């Protein structure tokens, strides 16, 4: 039964957390193994660089390990580690923002795309979608990636970013509107 499997996973996670809090450093390996791919994916979705995403994931796990005494027992580890890596990734992006703004000044993202020819393959469509998401303002881009690509719920994204659920919904709504406009040739226009 899926519910039993989930309860078993939750119990293993709780045991690992208790063991780490009790001084067993090896128990932390379970948490790293369970969450590393998704943590790296969250980081990559924000910083868009594989090496940086790997560094940020490692930094997030180190930071979480060093702060385990403050972690509330009985709470799931996932949202906590995702919040840590999101905050670290956003910090990296804040430092990059001024350079990116200078690089993109005066150019409209829509002007760079070739709207005369439709993408021929699924990978080209995926690349167009990825490019459209990348062109969004930072918080819209982060929220869109976490919701649309990573599949996090509004409340989870709110927890990770320290924004309200209403703000998350607003960023997501604006992002969707801009994506519909940029991808109108793929998805049938902007008459929605």
Q: Which residues does each predicted region cover?
A:
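Internal acidic/polar
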Residues: 1, 5-13, 98-126, 153
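C-terminal edge and immediately downstream basic/flexible tail or linker adjoining helix-turn-helix-like DNA-binding
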Residues: 2-8, 19, 123, 128-131, ...
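Short, charged helix-capping/linker segments at alpha-helix termini
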Residues: 3-5, 21-30, 40-59, 165, ...
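Sigma70-family region 2
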Residues: 21-22, 48, 61-76, 95-97, ...
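Short helix-capping/turn signature of helix-turn-helix
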Residues: 34-37, 45-48, 145-152
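Structural recognition of an alpha-helix C-terminal capping motif at a helix-to-coil junction
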Residues: 55-62, 75-87
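Arg/Lys-rich amphipathic alpha helix in sigma70-family domain 2
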Residues: 66-73, 83-103, 122, 174
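Helix-turn-helix DNA-binding module
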Residues: 131-134, 138-142, 146, 150-167, ...
């Amino acid at each position: 039964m899926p519910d039993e499997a989930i309860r078993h996973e939750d119990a293993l996670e709780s045991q690992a957390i208790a063991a780490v809090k009790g001084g067993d450093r090896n128990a932390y390996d379970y948490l790293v193994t369970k969450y590393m791919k998704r943590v790296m994916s969250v980081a990559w979705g924000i910083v868009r660089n594989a090496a940086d995403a790997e560094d940020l994931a490692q930094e997030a796990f180190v930071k979480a390990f060093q702060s385990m005494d403050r972690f509330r027992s009985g709470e799931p580890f996932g949202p906590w580690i995702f919040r840590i890596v999101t905050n670290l990734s956003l910090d990296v992006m804040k430092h990059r923002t001024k350079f990116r703004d200078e690089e993109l000044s005066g150019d409209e993202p829509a002007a760079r795309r070739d709207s005369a020819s439709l993408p021929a393959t699924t990978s080209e469509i995926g690349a167009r979608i990825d490019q459209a998401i990348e062109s969004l303002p930072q918080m819209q881009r982060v929220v869109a990636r976490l919701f649309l690509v990573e599949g996090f719920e509004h409340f989870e994204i709110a927890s990770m970013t320290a924004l309200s659920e209403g703000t998350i919904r607003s960023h997501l709504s604006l992002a969707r509107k801009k994506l519909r406009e940029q991808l109108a040739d793929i998805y049938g226009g902007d008459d929605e």
